[in-house]
Amino acid sequence: MSAVAYDSLLSTTAVISTVFQFLSGAMICRKYIQKKSTGDSSGVPFICGFLSCSFWLRYGVLTNEQSIVLVNIIGSTLFLVYTLIYYVFTVNKRACVKQFGFVLTVLVVVIVYTNRLEDQRDRMIHVTGIVCCIVTVCFFAAPLASLLHVIRAKNSESLPLPLIATSFVVSLQWLIYGILISDSFIQIPNFLGCILSLLQLGLFVLYPPRSYSGHGYKLVEQAVPF
């Protein structure tokens, strides 16, 4: 298999895997619709997912990486739909509007700033890539609290093994793809994603679940690589 064909195959499988990962939010929204309430859950993961995918979409357009563009068009659309569903069923609509307004402001400010660098395309790509990495790393910081809880309780039953394993595979695929196309902005966040997933998988070995269910795991605790 040629290098070009291998790159194409890897990017295609990575896109498919990532979209399936994004679709995990649909199960949560389904519960909102069934209960006609969001309960005490937060809409921040959906809103931040929209922000992350929007930035990566911008990066994909600037670098002409079609796989990045495709997966983040799908991702930003899904997270926007999830946010709208959350808004419909939450009692705290004002907070949701404020959070989404803040995210939109950040998005617009970054786009306007990078557009001013149009004559310096490499710098435009560099700045956008840094922003993408920062946003993604912030996602990866979210599960750390749950990891500390598992370590204190010495019980990993609150962690969903299938979702964590999927996250590892997705991050690994994008990491390899980033290496193949020599893109450090794709490599760095997905390397961190692999490490985080391995840490969580390691907790299953160190602290086996006493009665595994995984129901306590919330979307906020799952990082989104793209």
From Swiss-Prot:
TM segment ranges: 9-29, 43-63, 68-88, 95-115, 130-150, 161-181, 185-205
Keyword Endoplasmic reticulum carried by entry: no
Domain of life (superkingdom): Eukaryota
Cellular compartments per GO CC: Golgi membrane; membrane; plasma membrane
Stretches assigned to the MtN3/slv domain: 9-93, 128-210
GO BP: any one term: carbohydrate transport
Record has Transmembrane helix as a keyword: yes
Membrane topology annotation: Multi-pass membrane protein
Family: Belongs to the SWEET sugar transporter family.
PANTHER family assigned to the protein according to its UniProt record, in alphabetical order: RAG1-ACTIVATING PROTEIN 1 (PTHR10791), SUGAR TRANSPORTER SWEET1 (PTHR10791:SF112)
Record protein name field: Sugar transporter SWEET1
Organism for this UniProt entry: Drosophila melanogaster (Fruit fly)
Name of the gene: slv
